[in-house]
């Protein structure tokens, strides 16, 4: 019964937060923002720029402009090639919420990225995480895969448990 009550409470809370987000976007006068708002996606560190260069029409002028290409970290790599996704999972038996994190090398040109550092605040977990997979070195600095390369197309994942999710984003990487 407790699990069911927790599920119902979490569902109601998510609808309440979604409604509050829509109200705040509406209050800020951003109808264009509301069209782009999608709260069903998982957290990601990469912007929504595609890997192809697209020509966009400037509003009002009708002239074309190029989209901004992500900053490159090597001949083959872009800073957005490492993507961090996070999703809610089943809570631990003691009720602490659980989260799954996936860190993926999405480089399309076959680059191998190493020394992946993640902005992670005071990251901690009630569930043990293999420190060779993910560990906090200092405040807001977590190391992925013990600094070893993450080959292109590879995904590294781990689970953690805490009363709230941490905002995880790529701080810096090295491209080989």
From Swiss-Prot:
KW 4Fe-4S (keyword) present: no
Protein keywords: Differentiation, Signal
GO BP field: anther development; cell fate determination
Superkingdom of the organism of origin: Eukaryota
InterPro entries on file: TPD1
A Pfam cross-reference name: TPD1_C
Signal peptide positions (record): 1-21
Disruption phenotype: Male-sterile phenotype due to the absence of tapetum. Presence of extra microsporocytes in the developing anthers. No effect on cell wall degradation during microsporocyte formation.
Tissue specificity of this protein: Expressed in leaves, young seedlings, inflorescence meristems, floral meristems, carpel primordia and ovule primordia.
Subunit structure: Interacts with EMS1.
Function according to Swiss-Prot or TrEMBL: Involved in cell specification during anther and pollen development. Required for the differentiation, specialization and persistence of tapetal cells in the anthers. May serve as an extracellular ligand for the EMS1 receptor kinase to signal cell fate determination during plant sexual reproduction.
Name of the molecule in the record: Protein TAPETUM DETERMINANT 1
């Amino acid at each position: 019964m407790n699990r069911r009550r927790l599920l119902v409470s979490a569902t109601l809370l998510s609808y309440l937060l979604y409604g509050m987000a829509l109200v705040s976007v509406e209050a800020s006068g951003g109808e264009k923002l509301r069209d782009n708002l999608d709260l069903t996606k998982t957290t990601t560190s990469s912007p929504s720029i595609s890997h192809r260069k697209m020509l966009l029409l400037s509003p009002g002028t009708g002239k074309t402009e190029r989209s901004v290409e992500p900053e490159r970290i090597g001949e083959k790599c872009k800073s957005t090639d490492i993507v961090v996704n996070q999703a809610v999972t089943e809570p631990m038996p003691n009720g602490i919420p659980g989260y799954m994190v996936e860190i993926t090398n999405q480089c399309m040109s076959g680059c191998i990225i190493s020394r992946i550092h993640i902005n992670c605040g005071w990251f901690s977990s009630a569930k043990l995480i293999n420190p060779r997979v993910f560990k906090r070195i200092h405040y807001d600095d977590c190391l992925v895969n013990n600094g070893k390369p993450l080959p292109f197309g590879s995904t590294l994942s781990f689970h953690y448990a805490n009363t709230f999710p941490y905002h995880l984003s790529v701080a810096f990487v090295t491209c080989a």
